[in-house]
């Protein structure tokens, strides 16, 4: 069997288990000839075990025969940090206005969730990446 030729890659951020064939997904997939409802059905099945509504990045590969495959990534660190400390958004001026504090334990939970998608060889390196994300949002990391 011949290998399918990938013609396009589409990156989206979609709520887990709650995708709907609406404008955002339709506008992204339509120009490539991919069936929006088919993607939504498969995406919702694959993300059913995740927390409903948490936004997850998905990379869709479109092939020359209009078929597709996709990879679901872990939720963005900023969303996990906001959820962990219960805030709506990060600080507009992260270096002066602090919006909250996060414990090292909560940060390590986020590191363990994000580890498959991070470019880090160890948990301590990943901790530095995630704590940097927290600081850039105006969230203080406990010492």
UniProtKB/Swiss-Prot annotation:
Q: Name one GO cellular component term.
A: cytosolic large ribosomal subunit
List the Pfam families.
Ribosomal_L11, Ribosomal_L11_N
* PTM info: One or more lysine residues are methylated.
Q: Which InterPro entries match?
A: Ribosomal_uL11, Ribosomal_uL11_bac-typ, Ribosomal_uL11_C, Ribosomal_uL11_C_sf, Ribosomal_uL11_CS, Ribosomal_uL11_N, Ribosomal_uL11_N_sf
According to the UniProt entry, its GO molecular function terms are: large ribosomal subunit rRNA binding; structural constituent of ribosome
Q: Write out the similarity annotation.
A: Belongs to the universal ribosomal protein uL11 family.
Give the multimer and partner information: Part of the ribosomal stalk of the 50S ribosomal subunit. Interacts with L10 and the large rRNA to form the base of the stalk. L10 forms an elongated spine to which L12 dimers bind in a sequential fashion forming a multimeric L10(L12)X complex.
What name does UniProt use for this protein? Large ribosomal subunit protein uL11
Organism of origin: Borreliella afzelii (strain PKo)
Q: What is the lineage of its organism?
A: Bacteria, Pseudomonadati, Spirochaetota, Spirochaetia, Spirochaetales
Q: Which gene encodes it?
A: rplK
